[in-house]
Amino acid sequence: MSLKDLSNNLRTEDEFHTFTKKERVIRRQLSLHHLHKELINVIRSQEDTQERKTNVKAFMTDWYLHQMNSYVNEVCNSAIDIVKSLQVKDQKGTLDKFFTFDCWGAVYSENDYTLPHTHGPALWSWVYYIEVPYNAPPLYFKEAKLKVFPKTDELIMFPGQVIHEVPKAIDMIGERIVLAGNIYLDYRNT
């Protein structure tokens, strides 16, 4: 080891480095069309609780919609089933205890959008598309240069730390109605 290497290893301050890693984006049709009318009614019956003060610059419900409605919770459970099917393992074995921390509804109209953001410590984040109108903007992952144009009844899932956004809805015919949520690993009962 050179003196330079040795001196570098003696540093005590934080260092910042750029890491690039492949991330999984999962797309699944859920076959939950039979719930769409109820889900739309649940979302529309809520107030715009967030008032465009979050990254979502569109109508947005309370953060914990899944705790208020069994139909919404059914979508959350479908998302958890997808995570369980991945058979993730660590040194303790298969990780199979997950929970929905938060879930909300959003309605995007003309000129609505979502700013670039992550979902912090969430293991997985997802968006379920209840209604996707003609010319709706994609879910955009800038770092990967990936534009995902969703379909009705599709759930798109990605790691919570991945930066994503929704570009401004220009010339969109109708409204895009979604549920979104975050899944965490449940260490409480391991």
Where on the chain are the PLM-derived regions?
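Catalytic core of non-heme Fe(II) oxygenases with the double-stranded beta-helix
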Residues: 91-168, 173-190
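Non-heme Fe(II)/2-oxoglutarate
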Residues: 1-96
